């Protein structure tokens, strides 16, 4: 490999059992399934902490969250902590970050300012996306109900715009060494995606885990507070888990990733490609939703696939 080229693709809130290649045939994820067939699929990959900012702080600094001020979503990295973009840029590697950042101490969407070490021409955090929208469009972009009321086009979504920038970067930097991050917010809520994706799961019931019947007895106080709004006190045996928007967005981001993989094959066929997610989602297991201060398998076990070493296999060892 004459040039050093690495493409790091990350999603948000994507469980391992939401990918076909991890043993869930009902999930329509052909792009990532293809990547798994061409690389190494890690069976026991775990996040350092199952919350967005802490998980990302570990990935992009190489430090544990408690060592770089990555304790919670509202924290920014310590001033004395260098991210991988800074370190690689100092070594002459063109580093670009496209997508959700969540490490600047701002709100969920970021500050819209390029972080140290990355190419400002390609910086595109979620604040940058919101600045492109009208006030009405901003509201629609954060409401799950928008998908029922309006014809959401692919071009309107954050995922599509991240993909377009990634493809542009790959085409224009085909002859250079680079480190490209493509960080999708999807399939994190509000699960915005075109109808053709969420309608694929209309009426589909996600497998019912036995631990969805757990009670809150003997659980710590924070667990009970977390479960307060979602705890199904009655008739939980009859509860049907039908997250069509979540699963639809899961297939949508796979579709967008597929376009990046195709561009990589054309413009950077020798690139190392790494794919993972920051954490999973409880999906009512243990009476909980989303993610948070717990170490349950549903939120700590993450997908991890690496292509670029001429190997096609699964790795059974624990990694993080």
What is each model feature region?
Residues 52, 104-105, 283:
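Generic structural signal for helix capping and beta-alpha/helix-loop junctions
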Residues 2, 13-26, 126-161, 169-320:
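Active-site-proximal cap/lid insertion segments
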Residues 4, 20-56, 62-63, 92-96, ...:
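Short, structured active-site-proximal loop/turn typified by the sulfatase FGly-forming signature C/S-X-P-X-R
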